[in-house]
Regions:
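Basic, flexible Lys/Arg- and Gly-enriched helix-loop patches that mediate nucleic-acid binding at interfaces
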Residues: 1-216
Length: 216
């Protein structure tokens, strides 16, 4: 139904509201957090080995907000491997989470890697052209060498692929094993100055930008 006059009543539990094609969040219990996942934390809700998991950061946030219903549960959106740190979302917005993880909506992700050895000029070109891995070809959209020397280099890489450990495998394939890796951007979102272990709720503008990215 298209509404052209103010004052029309809607039920946010059964109706979806859109403005200029973008979904408008009307449920205050829909929460999406940005987490700076520390290295060593497992991206899972429960770990049989007893290692720290990202689920604890969601529980901590909810514990700090007793006004929210006890039934709320924040789930990780996608994953980062255990030794990778950086930007990870925790959310109870099922539709947004589903689209962010769906292969047809692969959004750009930017990582900063500290690698072994000095990166030669051919390496970024090779990564952009594509590398054949055991599960198919992988290529970067953009590669920037931030610093390079015999003792190690800093490489920023942006790509759309969501394959497991893809950045580590690509850099290893060109002779530069990763010693530290952090995701700094996810689509329109930037990690900014969020410190490891910290969380913050996404702003309305950030939610709207994510929705636009995945066609909501």
């Amino acid at each position: 139904i298209t509404v052209t006059e103010p004052g029309v009543r809607v039920d946010p539990l059964t109706q979806e509201i859109r403005l200029d094609g973008s979904r408008v969040l009307t449920d205050p219990e829909l929460i999406t957090l940005m987490l700076h996942k520390p290295a060593g934390v497992v991206t899972t809700m429960e770990d049989p080995e007893g290692r720290p998991t990202v689920a604890q950061y969601g529980r901590d946030y909810l514990a700090e907000h007793p006004e929210l219903p006890d039934s709320l549960r924040l789930v990780h959106v996608g994953r980062l491997d255990t030794e990778t740190e950086g930007l990870l979302l925790l959310s109870n917005d099922g539709e947004l989470s589903h689209r962010l993880m769906h292969p047809s909506f692969e959004i750009a992700k930017t990582y900063v890697a500290i690698v072994e050895g000095q990166v030669e000029p051919w390496v970024p070109r090779k990564l952009r052209r594509g590398i054949e891995l055991e599960d198919g070809e992988a290529k970067a959209d953009r590669v920037t060498v931030k610093d390079s020397g015999p003792r190690g280099s800093i490489v920023e890489i942006t790509l759309h692929s969501g394959k497991n450990r893809i950045v580590r495998r690509m850099l290893d394939a060109v002779g530069h094993p990763v010693t530290r890796l952090a995701r700094t951007r996810l689509g329109p979102l930037r990690l900014g100055n969020l410190r490891p272990g910290q969380t913050r709720p996404l702003s309305g503008e950030e939610i709207a930008a994510l929705q636009q990215e995945v066609g909501l």
